[in-house]
A protein has these predicted regions:
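Short alpha-helical segments that sit at the start of domains
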Residues: 4-30, 110-121
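Short helix-capping/hinge SLiMs at alpha-helix to coil transitions
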Residues: 34-38
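Short acidic, hydrophobic short linear motifs in intrinsically disordered regions
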Residues: 39-49
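Short amphipathic alpha-helical interaction segments
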Residues: 50-65
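Accessory beta->alpha helical hairpin/"wing" motif in late/C-terminal subdomains of nucleic-acid enzymes
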Residues: 71-97
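Exposed, interaction-prone assembly regions rather than primary DNA-binding/catalytic cores
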Residues: 107-205
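C-terminal regulatory/effector modules of DNA-binding transcriptional regulators
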Residues: 188-232
Length: 232
């Protein structure tokens, strides 16, 4: 991963109240984007956004003041969630990026309050931030729609690529048997296909047979169906 940068970070360039807009290259937009695809973010993502302590405090104060985020605290766990206003802003700026996460009853759009689910969302937010920091695409419009049902030519795009569990579930009924997998997603690299898990400081309740079914599912759809010859 790139080394963390030190020093002050330039202030975010946006004014939601006056313009209903935001600079999509700003730290504010990057933070809101991660919250959107995660459902609830951990404060542990801040270093991966190169946020200094002083800048982070100002940014959080501004986003809360503008009504774009809220702090959810329960069971001694603090997390950052989007407000309705924050979701509407992101959908207006980039519907192709956020519509899949912010327009239905998914866990990212309507995160629950029980501790195990919140921990999973926060662990996912850290993993996404790490991948993004390493230059690996995590947002839908940045990568091919592998699970849309249309054949893909692996020679036309660059690896590595990351796909969340939510994205592979676009295949529909075929994924029902792996819905309980604890995987956060898959990482496609030049030499191998990796299934990613993030346990953090808490143990995961494994569904052994589900993970075996996931392995078989990926072997069929990615190794044989989508990318024959790429992975042996």
């Amino acid at each position: 991963l790139p080394e963390f940068q030190s020093g002050m970070v330039k202030s975010a360039h946006y004014n939601y109240k006056k313009e209903n807009s935001m600079d999509t290259s700003s730290k504010a937009y990057k933070l809101l984007s991660l919250i959107a695809i995660s459902g609830e973010c951990s404060k542990e993502i801040y270093p991966f956004l190169y946020l200094t302590d002083s800048y982070n405090e100002k940014l959080m104060t501004r986003l809360k003041s503008d009504g774009l985020i809220k702090i959810h605290y329960k069971d001694k766990l603090r997390g950052i969630r989007l407000t309705r206003r924050g979701k509407d802003l992101l959908l207006s700026l980039s519907p192709e990026r956020f519509s899949n996460n912010l327009t239905d009853n998914s866990e990212t759009n309507r995160p629950r309050s029980d501790l195990p689910r919140r921990l999973r969302l926060q662990q996912a937010s850290i993993a996404y931030a790490m991948l993004q920091c390493a230059g690996i695409p995590v947002y839908p419009e940045e990568k091919p729609a592998l699970f849309s049902g249309n054949p893909q030519d692996s020679a036309k795009f660059a690896l590595p690529l990351f796909y969340t569990a939510r994205e592979w579930k676009e295949l529909g009924a075929e994924t029902i048997k792996i819905n309980n997998s604890r995987s956060l997603g898959i990482l496609l690299c030049e030499d191998a296909l990796y299934v990613l898990y993030f346990t953090g400081d808490h143990p995961i309740k494994w569904e052994y047979r589900t993970e075996l079914r996931l392995k078989a599912f990926l072997n069929y759809h990615l190794k044989q169906d989508m990318f024959p010859g790429l992975y042996q």
